[in-house]
């Protein structure tokens, strides 16, 4: 699938700003396509620029120049690559690997908002709620190894979420509470200093 088809067959607008975003494509016109396609990349290690390097922009179509990717550091890129599973021939991220991405997004958006950046509070809340929606799908025996960096991010998320209100009932989650769910995450990811 090329950029022209992605633009034609998927929505490319950012919900909060209304601007086109060319790293996430949602709401396909055809039910044969996945609900969402996101483009990820890692920081290329083969491009090393000198401090005094001069970059020259290439003249290309305006919309094509907007094609972008969510840039991941090496630890998250490895989790993305190693955590894939195939569903109907489409690579998707496994449940236990998706949760740390949602937790990291929550941490990053929350920090950006605290630093005065324009961040939609609904997006922050969505990522927090997504963590709990996904957590209800894991079992007490589910385990996922994490790199030290991602494990630290998960610990930070779990520590900060302790002070947050999470309305499990409105998320359709019953028969448990936030404390039990966070304990399950500590277990799942082998985060030893469980409070």
Predicted regions, residues:
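Compositionally biased terminal segments of proteins
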Residues: 1-195
